[in-house]
Amino acid sequence: MSGQVYKRDNGANWNQTSDERLKKNIVDNNIGLAEIKQLRITSFEYRKADEIDMSLFPKANDPLQVIIEGEEGPHTGVIAQEIESVLPECVKTSDKGAKTVQADAITWALVNAVKELSAKNDALEERIKNLEGS
């Protein structure tokens, strides 16, 4: 199975296979607001290729160098090592030790966080309604 990928700005977009018929051991995932609140969003600049130990990356001097060289200026994102301490399942480590973040997994945690906040909001609205009706 494969998805479509294309590069735009500072990322790639994927169509991820999600058909229920391809999955098993399906359980609810409760990662949400508590974990999201621990994540630090950073502003950063990519190092130049000559500032990086390219041996950390499987195919040194290929797309990584092109991506880094083409991504000058400030960026917004996360640090894989920090994400790993909160959501280890969202970080992959190569055999050389380079880390990547699975942003789609964080997206699903955000969905759960929004659902949690919505439930809290609904409960507060109901409480206000009951207090005003007293």
Identify the residue ranges that each predicted region occupies:
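Small/polar residue-rich beta-strand/coil "junction" motifs that cap repeat-based extracellular fibers
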Residues: M1-N25
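C-terminal intramolecular chaperone/auto-processing assembly modules
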Residues: S18, K23, P58-I68, P88-S134
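Periplasmic N-terminal gating module of Gram-negative TonB-dependent outer-membrane receptors
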Residues: K24-Q38
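Internal, charge-rich low-complexity segments
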Residues: E45-K59
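Active-site-adjacent helical/loop segments in soluble small-molecule enzymes
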Residues: F44, I83
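Phosphate-proximal small/polar/acidic motifs at interfaces that engage nucleotide phosphates
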Residues: I79
